[in-house]
Amino acid sequence: MAKKDKKTLPPSGAGLVRYFEEETKGPKLTPEQVVVMSIILAVFCLVLRFSG
């Protein structure tokens, strides 16, 4: 059998997008801020529901 030459890509990323390097627009929120805002929204909805 003949030995096949295996061609490998260089270990540079091979065209993959690195999302953590992409600059995004919009507010930067921590997980704690998201949880607090969700709780506030839920309480606000309950107040509106039962207030009349």
Curated annotation (Swiss-Prot):
Q: Any transmembrane segments, and where?
A: 31-50
Where does it primarily localize?
membrane
Quote the protein name from its UniProt record. Answer: Preprotein translocase subunit SecG
Spell out the GO cellular component terms annotated for this protein, sorted alphabetically and separated by semicolons.
Answer: plasma membrane
- Which keywords accompany this UniProt record? Cell membrane, Membrane, Protein transport, Translocation, Transmembrane, Transmembrane helix, Transport
Which parts of the chain does the record assign to the membrane side Cytoplasmic?
1-30
Protein task: Involved in protein export. The function of the beta subunit is unknown, but it may be involved in stabilization of the trimeric complex.
Please name the gene that encodes this protein.
secG
> Per the record, what ranges lie on the membrane's Extracellular side?
51-52
